Amino acid sequence: MNQDKHPEITDEEQELITVEELSQKLELLYKDMEQIRRENLLFEAYLARNRKEIAKEDEVSEDKKGKGKKKDKNVDKKSLLLTNEEKFEIAQQEQDALKKQIDDGRIKSDQILETLRAILEETDMAITEIRKDAFDFQREILVGGENSRTGKIEAEKIIKFFEEKERQKDALIAKYSSKRTNLERQILKTNNQIQKKEEMGDDLKFIDFYQLQIENKKYVKEIDDKNKKLLALKISTNRISQTLKDEKQNLKQELDKGKEYASQMSERKKKISKIDAQIKSVKKVTSKLEKDRKIYDKQKEIFVQDNQDDVPQIMKYVQYKSKEQQLLYAIQNLERKIEIAELAYKKANRILQSSQQFQQK
């Protein structure tokens, strides 16, 4: 009969419809289970937070029951269920508790952040102080404390430097001690005022609170201005440190160049002294040859005078001519060497003078 009434729906379509309905019901069940799970978590948190109060209420209720245990068995299960108003109240209490925890956590995190900022600021100040001390030590001891005669650092300057630093530290300690004493006095005075107001029951009036707000804004503005100045000083210090580093590098390069020029000058001086020795040696040889030439010229004149009337022998004449040619050739070679040595000497003198001028600059 059903097939006659609904001929268009087959058995397979009917099964598909049934499966779809079951899937929808299952999805609704999952949603209900998720809601119940969240409610249970909320109630567990409420019980954990109010466990002591609930235990006291249970003890009081058990004392009141007394002999009515049989009646309790017949209590309707509906009385054990929470109403929507009770659920709302529990949820509201848990929300307030969670909000309070968040506020407390925010306050603690702000306190920790302020502490970390103070530590960071103190660390930056310490780093700046260390850099300044290192710069002063390098300027006054490593550079200015070197003895020009021995090339070593004088111990007296080191002792004087550290004594001066110790005096500065003592003065700083005294300054901070005085500041700490003043702050302790102010804290003690403020605590006494607060205690007096608490004893008198005098609360802060609106105008006092407004005045405190104005002062707080003023101090916050001053702190911001000082922080900006401190940041600018830090940037300037970093820039100066970088410039100093670059200048040190340039100074090192110039010193290396100076050492190289000094080495070149030493080598050139050695060459000049060697050339001077060669020139002296050549001059001695030249002088000797000149003497020999003069002697030869005299001998030649004597020979010519003695043999003006005689015919000279051919072999002696050839020997004299050969010896004369050798002497002339030796003289020419020596004169050429003298010219070369003089040119080298002049060149070396020019190089030495230019090196001395560069060293004076």
Curated annotation (Swiss-Prot):
Deletion phenotype: Mutants swimming speed is reduced compared to wild-type with trajectories wavy and kinky. Cilia length is not affected.
Keywords: Cell projection, Cilium biogenesis/degradation, Coiled coil
Localization of this protein: Cell projection, Cilium
Major site of localization recorded for this protein: other
Domain of life assignment: Eukaryota
GO biological process, one term: cilium assembly
A single cellular component GO annotation: ciliary basal body
Matches recorded under Pfam families: CCDC113_CCDC96_CC (PF13870)
Family designation: Belongs to the CFAP263 family.
Function summary: In complex with CFAP263, acts as a regulator of ciliary beating that connects radial spoke 3 (RS3) to the inner dynein arm (IDA) and the nexin-dynein regulatory complex (N-DRC). The complex is positioned parallel to N-DRC and forms a connection between the arch at the base of RS3, the IDA tail and N-DRC.
Record PANTHER family: COILED-COIL DOMAIN-CONTAINING PROTEIN 113 (PTHR15654:SF2), COILED-COIL DOMAIN-CONTAINING PROTEIN 113-RELATED (PTHR15654)
Subunit and interaction comment: Forms a complex with CFAP184; the interaction is required for functional activity in cilia.
Protein name, entry field: Cilia- and flagella-associated protein 263
Organism: Tetrahymena thermophila (strain SB210)
